[in-house]
Amino acid sequence: FYKKHNLHGIVGGNTGTQMGGWFRKEIKTPADLQGLKMRIAGIAGQVMAKLGAVPQQIPGGDIYPALERGTIDAAEWVGPYDDEKLGFNKVAPFYYY
């Protein structure tokens, strides 16, 4: 089934609050993650690093301005419902879960 539909599994799972994130650019292939600076921590950060992203450790209050200035390319926080209240969608319009 997987080969027939060109599907490739990526081992991961629900890691708490770091489950998805807001991205300044659209991600179409795993290659798009190469060198991408993302505010993400813990095991999710380790997974993203294996995919080529560069995990960044910045305080929650600095996420919006860092996305706005382009200091980081992507960020995770709580989840889309709460994150939209903080306006992340205005500076990073692509959300992936």
Q: What feature does the model see in each segment?
A:
Residues 2-97:
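N-terminal secretory/targeting leader peptides
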